[in-house]
């Protein structure tokens, strides 16, 4: 089959084609006529510098004349709508000059963009139609009379060569950019959008709203990012995720998702019930170690937990002119009668929010009010913030000189290690304990009770005190908290205060058995809202039996999840401390937490 070689596309569309080239098809003839755009200056025979100067002079002189007349009328108390003939002429001249200037500069400016976009679209349409024309022409034996064109033989100098797929340029090969991540059916349209994003014509954040397809928007954004940075994102998966589920609530401008393996530790026997604990982590040996701790707890009869407090906090900062006025508001807020009024205002924000107390602190003329409230099965940051805003609006009427500096004054304290959380608690305060028998300590944990007690005192208590730890009197509570948080859709940043933990170990029953406990004053979890509604995280919550909100006892699912977190931390602490006590830490990590391939490379 003979295939014609298409001549190279000129830099800009032209009105005529050189002799020997293929004739224009009817739709291209109309397209060439449309490309002959008029500009505003074509209607005037005078040189542009004369007409421009004339109308610029007319505009400014007439404007000055009208403003002067306007000022005189104001001084003489003359009605502005009474105009003379000269003023009518001036107004007409002003309108004429404005029309000319807008027509010349405004239309020309717009046409410069419109014509450029139209030309680009014309060339894209021409490329597509040319390829289709060549394929249709090759499939016919007779001349192409059905297209309304006269068959013109190719020029003698034009060689007949087979068409081959375009090869990637050397620059593209060096940058190792993958092919555009678009579907064949929409490749041309998506390619134009990708170019617009790369060139900065279309904001990347607006793709979802303009396309109406979240997955397609993520695909286009990912390809545009590869072209902008020159870095390959081939290993970042795009398929297999519901991007509609994160729109407007979990993540902005997505380009894919990160895969984190999820392991199962357990069964964890806690308060008479068994739980298989999902842990999302990339640290080898972590799940295995926690699983061993669960085994030791199970073999010893299980663990028990107690919920001490349940209240999310938010602490706005307000300022007064004097410290005395700040103290007056402090006394007002702490008054039991006034508190009932503030609680009623606060509780209007949600049917689950219930204000429990307000803790105040003064720094000069600044007052920090730490609101504590229950939030049902939600983690509750948005809920408590909304309630605090209602109270601030109410107090603004009572204290008009109160200046609200910010709805969060860091006396909360969120996503930061703070003594106020360690002492007063934030979220769920839980203590979890278990008695591990001597037999289990020796057979499962491979250590001795006395060795564990001594190590805990010197490491978790004395060592942490020497380091000036704030809530870090434990071995690795953060490891377990982070893994469970990621698996169940919690806020990973709140791992900071949620990992506040003190681990205690004592010998009981005449020194034969081990009493171990973890006290965690600020576990911040929820079973509704945020990442808990995503498919994978929702499945992990369902595995624990705490998916969604509990309709019968609001808040019970979130409280149960907090106790499961504490029980998992107890298992992790027990296993790691045993490994350190028995001298097995390095051996186990070299076996489970380090690649054999990496060890070989390091030794060679």
Curated annotation (Swiss-Prot):
One function term, GO molecular function aspect: hydroxymethylglutaryl-CoA reductase (NADPH) activity
EC class name: oxidoreductase
Region (Catalytic), start-end ranges: 190-604
Induction note: In leaves, by wounding, elicitation, bacterial or fungal infection.
Top-level division of the source organism's lineage: Eukaryota
Residue segments, region Disordered: 1-31
Tissue: Found in protoplasts and leaves submitted to stress. Low levels found in apexes, anthers and roots.
Keywords, comma-separated and alphabetical: Endoplasmic reticulum, Glycoprotein, Isoprene biosynthesis, Membrane, NADP, Oxidoreductase, Transmembrane, Transmembrane helix
Listed transmembrane segments: 40-62, 90-110
Pathway this chain belongs to: Metabolic intermediate biosynthesis; (R)-mevalonate biosynthesis; (R)-mevalonate from acetyl-CoA: step 3/3
InterPro entries: HMG_CoA_Rdtase, HMG_CoA_Rdtase_cat_sf, HMG_CoA_Rdtase_CS, HMG_CoA_Rdtase_eu_arc, HMG_CoA_Rdtase_N, HMG_CoA_Rdtase_NAD(P)-bd_sf, HMG_CoA_Rdtase_sub-bd_dom_sf
Residue positions with a glycan: 347, 460, 593
Subcellular location: Endoplasmic reticulum membrane
GO terms, biological process: coenzyme A metabolic process; isoprenoid biosynthetic process; sterol biosynthetic process
Chief localisation class: endoplasmic reticulum
GO cellular component labels: endoplasmic reticulum membrane; peroxisomal membrane
Annotated EC: 1.1.1.34
Recorded family membership: Belongs to the HMG-CoA reductase family.
NCBIfam families registered for this protein in UniProt: HMG_CoA_R_NADP (TIGR00533)
Protein name, UniProt field: 3-hydroxy-3-methylglutaryl-coenzyme A reductase
Organism this protein belongs to: Nicotiana sylvestris (Wood tobacco)
